[in-house]
Curated annotation (Swiss-Prot):
GO molecular-function terms, A-Z: 3-phosphoshikimate 1-carboxyvinyltransferase activity
Family stated for the protein in its record: Belongs to the EPSP synthase family.
GO cellular-component term (any): cytoplasm
Organism, as annotated: Deinococcus radiodurans (strain ATCC 13939 / DSM 20539 / JCM 16871 / CCUG 27074 / LMG 4051 / NBRC 15346 / NCIMB 9279 / VKM B-1422 / R1)
EC number(s) stated in the UniProt entry for this protein: 2.5.1.19
Subunit structure: Monomer.
Subcellular location: Cytoplasm
Binding site for 3-phosphoshikimate: 29, 34, 171-173, 199, 316, 343
Protein name, UniProt field: 3-phosphoshikimate 1-carboxyvinyltransferase
Primary localization class, coarse: cytoplasm
Length: 439
């Protein structure tokens, strides 16, 4: 890790008077993992410029290296010497707690004569369902072994391709996994997505990645039909990772909640990350956000008001935006966010519990979360980070506006997606203490 913090720690968030300064948005976690995998599936050398330093990125690099790819870190870049369509067989891969990494690699594992997936996070990734992807791989002819659709999992090919259905009800990552596999199969892949498709934006990011590496693929407007011709090759070269909107949503929200002025650069205006919508949500709530090219300027401290929004397209920003809702006038509701229950924690029930612990009013349904805003938050207690990086972001933002310091347990889990989160906020004027972890 690039930070100098202990391996495990709690964070004590001190109330902030204002936030002021300039930051460059961290590289996108979603694009980093996709670009690294595509680079490994190419034959030859690819330079991925400006990779994220998150635990997910490290998990992908570690697994690709174990599978036989050459990996060299040069400054902020990763130079990958790919294995093409021939990852090593007989390898056990441990993606840690990185669900997307695990699923993407499970799809590609059908190119091998046997790959096993394990995790040292049995109570998190180990409990997350993979059955929809495994069933699709079996229908393509792969051999699969699992613990009732959960890790440990073994996958082995060969498969030729063809037409296959995959459910997108729980996650879009299952379809993305098959999309990475498709171009390297002799017969290609005709994907039919079933169920209520969750998170269209990540699917478009995968299509974007395939295009960046010279792979031909077409999709219907509703993404229910995706066609990928077979016998293709990923083209090596040089790709630049864009800025990360999910993590930046937390910085933008913090800047909106407190007086001051914050400029955040490296956020493309025409970007496929669904969490870009967080900018519009904050504006709708009353935040003063101005865009100049790839830079957003937030003039904070304005009164915010509640909104009701379908959060399906920006699920990874819902936690950060919930901090804005906590101080907005009225009742804010995030609808159609059932997939939040399948993350590192249950981001609906656990969020409701933490908000109530802090004295706020919150309600949940099977697929929604509602928050009643309050002008003040007492703080002065210990909140549970639930081992979830997005929950830690939410609680940190609440602590910045609280009347007294707020302690968050297990704050080291922020490293999963945003290792520099606390350092970036400190650069804007926030103050934190780091204590021995209690959970």
């Amino acid at each position: 890790m690039s930070d100098a913090l202990p391996a495990t720690f709690d964070v004590i968030v001190h109330p902030a008077r204002e936030l002021r300064g300039e930051l460059r948005a961290q590289p996108s976690k979603n694009y980093t993992t996709r670009y690294l995998l595509a680079a490994a599936l190419a034959e030859g050398e690819t330079r991925v410029v400006g990779v994220a330093t998150s635990e997910d990125a490290e998990a992908m690099l570690r697994c690709l290296r174990d599978w036989g790819a050459g990996v060299e870190l040069v400054g902020d870049d990763a130079v990958i010497r790919g294995f093409g369509a021939r990852p090593q067989a007989g390898v056990t891969l441990n993606p840690g707690n990185a669900g997307a990494v695990a699923r993407f690699l499970m799809g590609v594992a059908a190119l091998t004569s046997g790959t096993t997936f394990v995790t040292d996070y049995p109570d998190s990734l180990g409990k997350r369902p993979q059955g929809d992807l495994l069933e699709a791989l079996e229908r393509l002819g792969a051999w699969v072994s699992s613990n009732d659709g959960r890790l440990p999992i073994s996958v082995s090919g060969p498969v030729r391709g063809g037409t296959v259905e995959v459910s997108a009800e729980r996650s879009s990552q299952y379809a993305s996994a098959l999309m990475f596999l498709g171009p390297l199969l002799p017969d290609g892949l005709e994907l039919r997505l079933t169920g209520d498709i969750k998170s269209h934006a990540p699917l478009r990011q995968t299509l974007d990645t395939l295009s960046d590496f010279g792979v031909r693929a077409t999709a219907s407007d509703d993404l229910r039909r995706i066609s990928i011709p077979g016998g293709q090759k990923y083209r090596p070269g040089r790709v630049l990772v864009p800025g990360d909107y999910p993590g930046s949503a937390a910085i933008l929200t913090a800047a909106a909640l407190l007086p001051g002025e914050v400029r955040l650069s490296n956020l493309r205006e025409h970007d496929l990350q669904g969490e870009k919508e967080a900018v519009n949500v904050l504006r709708e709530m009353g935040a003063d956000i101005v865009r100049e090219g790839d830079t957003l300027t937030v003039r904070g401290g304005r009164p915010l008001h509640a909104v009701t929004r379908d959060g399906d397209s920006f699920t990874d920003a819902v936690q950060a935006l919930t901090a804005a809702a906590a101080f907005a006038e009225g009742d804010t509701t995030w609808e159609n966010v059932a997939t939040l229950r399948l993350k590192e924690c249950d981001r609906i029930s656990d969020t409701r519990a933490e908000l109530e612990r802090l004295g706020l009013r919150a309600r949940e349904t099977a697929d929604s979360l509602s928050v009643t805003g309050s002008a003040h938050l007492a703080g002065g207690i210990t909140a549970d980070g639930h081992g979830d990086h997005r929950m830690i972001m939410l609680l940190t933002l609440l602590g910045l506006r609280a009347d007294a310091p707020l302690r968050i347990t297990g704050a080291h889990h922020i490293r999963k997606s945003y290792p520099q989160f606390f350092a970036h906020l400190e650069a804007l004027g926030a103050r934190f203490e780091y204590a021995e972890a209690t959970a």
